[in-house]
Amino acid sequence: MRYHVAGQSHRGVVRESNQDVVDWRINDAGDQALLVVADGMGGHQGGEVASRLAVDAVIESLEPAIAGAAFDGTDGAIREHLERAFSLANERIVNRRSGDPKLEKMGTTLVVAWVIDDQAHIAHVGDSRCYSLRSSQAVCLTRDDTVVQNMLEDGS
């Protein structure tokens, strides 16, 4: 399988800085791709720091597996790898926050698509979304991980 990846981000018209990070890796064999998007929380200092920390942690954690390190490619093993990657990202953000009072409220959304052959494994936190685009149709693959979404689903 051959992957073609491109990424672009724009700060928008409201923010003074771009707090988004888009990054990816494709292994040498061309059968796996890791796609990562993070959107720092606007309105708080350090969103760009949190999003960069999160993306770097995910890539650091998962790159050995996509590069061909021995790993069990079952859904359970993939889920475990993704959970560890998200935990590492969270740990890095928490550690950085605790070292700088100005960054105490920094945070980020995070979306990861780990594509193996023709199957995508998606993990996310926050309200950044992952879509599947086929035949000019976009289908949302994620559910917003927010208080508002929970209230809507609960009928609150």
What are these regions (language model features)?
Residues M1-S156:
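PP2C/PPM-type serine/threonine phosphatase catalytic domain
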